C-alpha cells in the first residue's frame, strides 16, 4: 500500500496552452545535434573530442573536469562539426552532424537483478549516463565517490505547463521499471507520484517504495519530497534522478546501447496546437517548435517550464533534463493605460487584487514574461512560507544567503533545498527578488567552502 502524503501549502498556476496527450507533433528532419554542458549543473566540462572526429551514439563528447570518470554521451553518431565557446573559453555546446545510418557503441546487455550497486555505477559511468544523476546537498550533478543514503525519483510534474510523465511512460514501462530496479541496487529508492498517475503507481516494486503526493505545486519537486520522507542533514547525501533519465538507464541495461530519445511537451499560449514531440537530447528547437509558434515576434521561448526554465531561442537545443519547451508572450509590446486601476479579469493574482478570482481556480491565464515592478525591500513576511511546503523558514534562509551567513544557512536547512523549490515563492514575491538565483549562488558558495 502506497504512503499518501497530503500537502496544503503551495500554489497551482493555471496557464493556457497545456500540451495535449492526443497531439503528436511533427519533427522536421535535421542532421545537426548538440550536447549542452550547461544543462548539467555543477559540471565543469573538459572536451574529449576534436572537430572532425567521428563518434558513435554513446561515445563521450566531454567529461567532468573535476571527475573525469563521469562522461557525457553523444546522442547520435556522426562527425563533430563545432565546439562552440563563449566568454573565458566556456564550452557552450558540442555540435555533431548525424550520419544517415546511425551506429551505437555496444556496452552489452545486462541482467539488473544479479548486479550489485558498484556494477550499476560502473555501467552508467562507461555509457556516459552517470552525470544525469543529481544530488542534494547543492543540487548539482553528482560524482561516483559520493555514497547516497537514499535515491529519489519524482514523476509528478506540476509546474505550470509541465509535461505529463504518464505520456512519456507509454511504451517505456519496461525500461522505467528496469532503471528503478538498477537504482535500488545502489541505495534505498523512493518513487514519488501524484494522485492522478495510475500507470506510474504500477511501476512500484518490492525494491522501490512508492509515495503518493496530494497537494498543489510544488508538491512534485523532488526536494519537497525528500524533505517529507528522509531530510538531508549536514554530511549526508541523497541522489535525485529525473524520471526520463531512469528510462535512459533502463534502455542501457535492456539493449546495451545509449538511447536518449524522449517525449517533450511543446506548450504555452503562443503555441498553435500544444502537444508532444518525439526528439533526442540535443535536437534543435527549430526542428519542432518554429512551425508551432503563432508568431515569432514578442514571444519568450523557454527551455523548460515558465517558472524554472531558461530563456531560449529557436537556435537552442533540447537539454539533458528538458521535459517541455514552452512559449509565452514576451509582453514588451503591451501598453496598458491605467492598468493598475482596471478590473483586469484576465490577470492572475494571489492576493485577489484583480476581479479574476471571481472566475474560480479553473480559469486559464495567458500570462506574459513581464516582472511588473522592480526589486524592493523584503517587507511582506510569510509570503514565501505560504507556498513552500517544506519544514524550513524560507524567508530567513533567503536573508541568510544574501548576508553570507553560512552558519545561519546551515541551521536553516540550506542542504535540503534546490533553486526550483523557491520557484513558486519567486512568482508570488512582492519584492521581485530573483530567489532561484539567490539560492543557486548560496549553494555554489557553500559548495566551495566545503570542498
Regions found by a protein language model. Give the residues of each.
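N-terminal, Lys/Arg-enriched amphipathic/low-complexity engagement segments
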Residues: 1-48, 63, 213
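Short, solvent-exposed cationic patches
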Residues: 27-29, 79-85
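Exposed loop/turn and edge beta-strand positions of beta-sandwich/beta-sheet ligand-binding modules
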Residues: 43, 74, 90
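Buried, small/hydrophobic-residue-enriched core segments of structured protein domains
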Residues: 70, 84-287, 291-451
Amino acid at each position: 500500500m502506497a504512503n499518501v502524503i497530503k500537502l496544503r501549502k503551495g500554489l497551482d498556476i493555471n496557464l493556457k496552452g497545456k500540451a495535449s496527450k492526443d497531439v503528436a507533433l511533427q519533427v522536421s528532419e535535421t542532421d545537426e545535434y548538440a550536447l549542452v554542458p550547461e544543462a548539467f549543473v555543477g559540471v565543469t566540462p573538459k572536451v574529449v573530442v576534436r572537430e572532425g572526429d567521428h563518434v558513435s551514439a554513446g561515445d563521450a563528447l566531454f567529461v567532468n573536469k573535476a571527475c573525469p570518470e563521469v562522461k557525457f554521451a553523444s546522442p547520435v553518431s556522426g562527425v563533430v562539426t563545432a565546439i562552440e565557446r563563449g566568454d573565458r573559453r566556456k564550452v557552450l555546446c558540442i555540435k555533431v552532424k548525424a550520419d544517415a545510418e546511425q551506429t551505437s557503441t555496444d556496452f552489452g546487455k545486462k541482467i539488473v537483478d544479479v548486479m550489485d550497486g558498484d556494477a550499476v555505477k560502473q555501467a552508467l559511468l562507461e555509457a556516459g549516463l552517470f552525470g544525469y544523476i543529481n544530488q542534494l546537498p547543492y543540487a548539482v550533478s553528482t560524482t561516483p565517490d559520493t555514497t547516497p543514503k537514499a535515491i529519489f525519483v519524482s514523476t509528478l510534474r506540476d509546474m505550470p505547463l509541465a509535461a505529463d510523465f504518464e505520456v512519456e511512460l507509454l511504451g517505456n514501462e519496461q525500461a522505467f521499471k528496469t532503471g528503478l530496479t538498477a537504482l535500488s541496487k545502489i541505495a534505498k529508492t523512493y518513487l514519488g507520484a501524484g494522485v492522478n498517475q495510475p500507470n506510474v503507481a504500477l511501476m512500484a516494486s518490492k525494491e522501490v517504495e512508492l509515495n503518493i503526493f496530494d497537494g498543489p505545486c510544488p508538491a512534485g519537486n523532488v526536494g519537497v519530497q525528500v524533505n517529507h520522507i528522509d531530510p538531508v542533514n549536514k554530511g549526508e547525501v541523497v541522489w535525485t534522478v529525473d524520471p526520463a533519465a531512469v528510462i535512459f538507464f533502463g534502455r542501457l541495461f535492456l539493449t546495451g546501447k545509449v538511447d536518449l530519445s524522449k517525449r517533450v511537451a511543446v506548450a504555452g499560449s503562443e503555441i498553435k496546437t500544444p502537444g508532444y514531440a518525439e526528439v533526442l537530447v540535443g535536437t534543435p528547437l527549430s526542428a519542432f517548435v518554429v512551425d508551432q509558434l503563432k508568431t515569432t515576434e514578442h514571444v519568450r521561448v523557454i527551455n523548460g517550464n515558465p517558472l524554472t526554465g531558461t530563456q531560449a531561442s529557436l537556435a537552442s537545443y533540447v537539454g539533458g533534463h528538458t521535459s517541455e519547451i514552452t512559449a509565452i508572450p514576451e509582453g514588451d509590446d503591451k501598453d496598458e493605460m491605467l492598468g493598475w486601476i482596471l478590473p483586469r479579469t484576465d490577470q492572475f493574482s494571489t492576493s485577489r487584487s484583480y476581479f479574476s478570482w471571481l472566475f474560480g481556480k479553473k480559469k486559464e491565464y495567458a500570462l506574459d514574461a513581464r516582472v511588473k515592478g522592480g526589486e524592493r525591500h523584503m517587507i511582506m513576511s510569510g509570503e514565501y512560507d505560504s507556498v513552500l511546503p517544506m519544514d524550513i523558514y524560507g524567508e530567513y534562509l533567503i536573508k541568510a544567503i544574501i548576508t553570507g551567513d553560512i552558519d545561519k544557512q546551515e541551521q536553516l536547512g540550506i542542504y535540503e533545498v534546490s533553486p526550483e523549490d523557491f520557484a513558486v515563492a519567486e512568482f508570488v514575491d512582492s519584492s521581485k527578488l530573483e530567489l532561484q538565483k539567490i539560492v543557486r549562488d548560496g549553494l555554489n558558495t557553500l559548495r566551495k567552502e566545503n570542498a
